[in-house]
Regions:
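Single-pass transmembrane signal-anchor helices and their membrane-water interface zones
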Residues: 1-3, 7-39
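Short, small/hydrophobic-biased targeting/export segments
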Residues: 40-79, 88-91, 96-199
Length: 199
């Protein structure tokens, strides 16, 4: 049985009126993006075995780091990884090309959950049984992550003019500054997106 993060309990469906007022910043699309290659990312996700007892962070070089559920995990603006405010050595971004924006993955097993701050300041609450793939440092044109499982994300308003894209195997969400919940477990036939706050 999946363990849900308490914050999810007060999430409510968006009304038709609210949804209509948010269409210009929030839309759902079944079409693939040309940014993150879904097939490649899904292969990356599938290749990583889910640990049974601990949260695992996999760097672009393949290094596996065990992370405590209560640890503070954050990425600085330059892509540096800090765990409990201690800098962890990783491959750094050196340019604007696809290969120069190394991808990391965090895997949360059943019965665990964790919070993570992305390089732009956006906050993730990652639920149990979830895998998230994300760049150490976002590109200038867009911000994009891939999710298999369930997360609550509070997108920072600092870069509200830059699209934030959440991809799953079933759909894509494109927002600006907003907060929402995404549920897209691999074994489930139905996926959900619940908008909590937006412009």
């Amino acid at each position: 049985k999946k363990k849900h993060i308490p914050v999810y309990r007060w999430l409510i469906p968006v009304t038709a009126v609210a949804a209509a007022s948010l269409l210009f910043v929030f839309w759902l699309n079944n079409q693939a993006y040309d940014t993150i290659h879904s097939a490649d990312v899904q292969e990356f996700v599938s290749a990583a075995n889910t640990p049974e007892k601990h949260i695992e962070l996999i760097t672009a070089t393949g290094t596996k780091i065990k992370v405590d559920e209560k640890a503070t995990v954050a990425y600085a603006q330059d892509g540096s990884l800090l765990i409990d405010e201690k800098k962890i050595a990783t491959r750094q971004s050196t340019g604007e090309g696809e290969e120069e924006h190394p991808m990391n993955q965090i895997i949360v097993p059943m019965g665990k959950h964790i919070k993570l701050q992305l390089s732009d300041g956006s906050q993730l609450d990652i639920n149990s049984g979830t895998k998230v793939v994300y760049p150490q440092k976002f590109k200038k044109e867009y911000r994009e992550i891939f999710v298999e499982g369930e997360i609550f994300i509070d997108v920072t308003h600092k870069e509200s003019n830059i699209p934030f894209i959440v991809k799953t195997s079933l759909f894509t969400v494109n927002v600006l500054g907003t907060a929402f919940n995404v549920k897209a477990y691999k074994e489930d036939t139905k996926a959900e997106v619940v908008l909590v706050r937006g412009k």
